[in-house]
Amino acid sequence: MSNVLELTIPASTANLGVGFDSIGMALDKFLHLSVKETSGTKWEYIFHDDASKQLPTDETNFIYHVAQQVASKYSVDLPNLCIEMRSDIPLARGLGSSASALVGAIYIANYFGDIQLSKHEVLQLATEIEGHPDNVAPTIYGGLIAGYYNDVSKETSVAHIDIPDVDVIVTIPTYELKTEASRRALPQKLTHSEAVKSSAISNTMICALAQHNYELAGKLMQQDGFHEPYRQHLIAEFDEVKTIASQHNAYATVISGAGPTILIFSRKENSGELVRSLNSQVVSCHSELVDINISGVKERIVYQ
């Protein structure tokens, strides 16, 4: 097979404050993969951006590992492949870079192993590997999605929510924050009353989004009790960014995923001025407007 598989895979932001490990939204920053068979004796990698050049090129490569895991599950053998990669999703910043790579790996195994997975099956596989659907679901489908993974039945359920009519700003620090380190900051247990309170806030926030009530949704996004209070101290710039966003009447300022990126829901009439203020005042970060992605992963076959 000499055909080339081309994948364009969006970034994602998870949690939206109170939707811990459940809610995610796709963003227009992308991992681009171009994959074809090689006559070599092992998988080959060509990286076109500096961040990707940090990645391993042996069997510990994440895409290789996941693709082989999927191939093994369906009892198929994959040929040796050459993967060209370019990404504008920063690594370990809370923008779903690992979820994008995971989804890409499943698509690679599916095509070159001729597995014929449905998109529903891709979601089930991705969530089983990832452990929760908050990043992988919007990466696959696009848009804003709430989901739940039942780790007993191994079944994932998702619900699509209307795209918010807001401008999205991401403030990206220069440093990484590994998900594992961010999760270590979380408590092992919450009291029953704490869990009930946070669940009620999350439920109401989702309803507010569905009703396009961004004032209420934003207010509730900032009242999380599951993870934000335990992670904010890991992000030195969080309080300053939130203060500046509030001065520009933003709807909400929350941690994107496990951090350190900070996500802002902004009023459209204020977003440009807000981004410029953030870039002039919070010089240790880069802030930018980013569109909500509505397409999810895109697959294209180039026949040769």
Curated annotation (Swiss-Prot):
Main localization, broad class: cytoplasm
GO molecular function, one term: ATP binding
Keyword check for Cytoplasm: yes
Record organism: Staphylococcus aureus (strain NCTC 8325 / PS 47)
Residues holding ATP: 90-100
Cited InterPro entries: GHMP_kinase_C_dom (IPR013750), GHMP_kinase_C_sf (IPR036554), GHMP_kinase_N_dom (IPR006204), GHMP_knse_ATP-bd_CS (IPR006203), Homoserine_kinase (IPR000870), Ribosomal_Su5_D2-typ_SF (IPR020568), Ribsml_uS5_D2-typ_fold_subgr (IPR014721)
UniProt similarity note: Belongs to the GHMP kinase family. Homoserine kinase subfamily.
Lineage start: Bacteria, Bacillati, Bacillota, Bacilli, Bacillales
NCBIfam families cross-referenced by the UniProt entry: thrB (TIGR00191)
UniProt protein name: Homoserine kinase
Pathway: Amino-acid biosynthesis; L-threonine biosynthesis; L-threonine from L-aspartate: step 4/5
